[in-house]
């Protein structure tokens, strides 16, 4: 087996780019939302900051989970067939 060069490594799933790693993106987004929540909750003191940070983390987790949920799209009923033969088209 031969060793891959840098160009081939970059083509394989974003190797070599730590900012494109999905896990680091999730951690960065959670930390960012926790910081924003803590900043908005700062008027409530330490307790408000904790509640704000928890709300920011919860928002990130729920939005990430909602993105992976199946989409329920109803299929419209289209009349098929002629109505003169009783097919209710």
Curated annotation (Swiss-Prot):
The keyword Ion transport is annotated on this UniProt entry: no
Annotated signal sequence range: 1-15
GO biological process, one term: killing of cells of another organism
Highest taxon in the source lineage: Bacteria
Usage in biotechnology: When avirulent E.coli transformed with a plasmid encoding the genes necessary for microcin production, secretion and immunity is fed continuously to broiler chickens it significantly reduces the S.typhimurium load in the intestinal tract. 44 of 57 reptile-derived Salmonella strains were sensitive in in vitro killing assays to the above strain, suggesting it might be used to reduce pet-acquired Salmonellosis.
Comment on activity versus temperature: Stable on heating to 80 degrees Celsius for 30 minutes, unstable at 100 degrees Celsius and to autoclaving.
Induction of synthesis: Induced during exponential growth in all media tested; activity remains in stationary phase, although expression varies depending on the growth medium (at protein level).
GO CC terms, sorted: extracellular region
Protein location: Secreted
Keywords: Antibiotic, Antimicrobial, Bacteriocin, Plasmid, Secreted, Signal, Virulence
Post-translation changes: Mass spectrometry suggests 3 of the 4 Met residues of the mature peptide are oxidized.
Disulfide bonds: none
Family: Belongs to the class IIa microcin family.
Function of the protein: Active against E.coli and Salmonella, but not Listeria or Campylobacter. Channel-forming microcin. Probably neutralized by its immunity protein McnI.
Name of protein: Microcin N
């Amino acid at each position: 087996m031969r060793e891959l060069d840098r160009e081939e490594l970059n083509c394989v799933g974003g190797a070599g780019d730590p900012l494109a790693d999905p896990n680091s993106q999730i951690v960065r987004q959670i930390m960012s939302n926790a910081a924003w929540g803590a900043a908005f909750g700062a008027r409530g003191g330490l307790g408000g900051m904790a509640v704000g940070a928890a709300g920011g983390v919860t928002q990130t987790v729920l939005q990430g989970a909602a993105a992976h949920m199946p989409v329920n799209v109803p299929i419209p009923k289209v009349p098929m067939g002629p109505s003169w033969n009783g097919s209710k088209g």
